[in-house]
Amino acid sequence: MVSVQMNDNESIDKMLKRFKKKYERAGVLKEFRQNAYFVKPSVDGRLKRSRSKRRAQRANEERNS
């Protein structure tokens, strides 16, 4: 559970910005999206390998450029 206390003389905008940052760092939304539907372990592994391969290719292209 992410919670934020409002500091003295702090605007609501700044408080919301701090909340959003904590919310993102906690990974709440990412976890929710991952658990929205079931993915078989074999499919999950395949997706992770393909993502890893793409990430490696991009990193390799950046190094060569």
From Swiss-Prot:
Keyword vocabulary terms for this entry: Ribonucleoprotein, Ribosomal protein
Disulfide bond sites: none
UniProt keyword Ribosomal protein present: yes
Ranges of biased composition (kind: Basic residues): 48-57
One CC-aspect GO term: ribonucleoprotein complex
Pfam families: Ribosomal_S21 (PF01165)
Gene3D superfamilies referenced in this protein's UniProt entry, alphabetically: Ribosomal protein S8 (1.20.5.1150)
Region annotation Disordered: where it falls in the sequence: 45-65
Gene Ontology MF terms: structural constituent of ribosome
NCBIfam families from the UniProt entry: S21p (TIGR00030)
Name of the protein this chain belongs to: Small ribosomal subunit protein bS21
Originating species: Chlorobium luteolum (strain DSM 273 / BCRC 81028 / 2530)
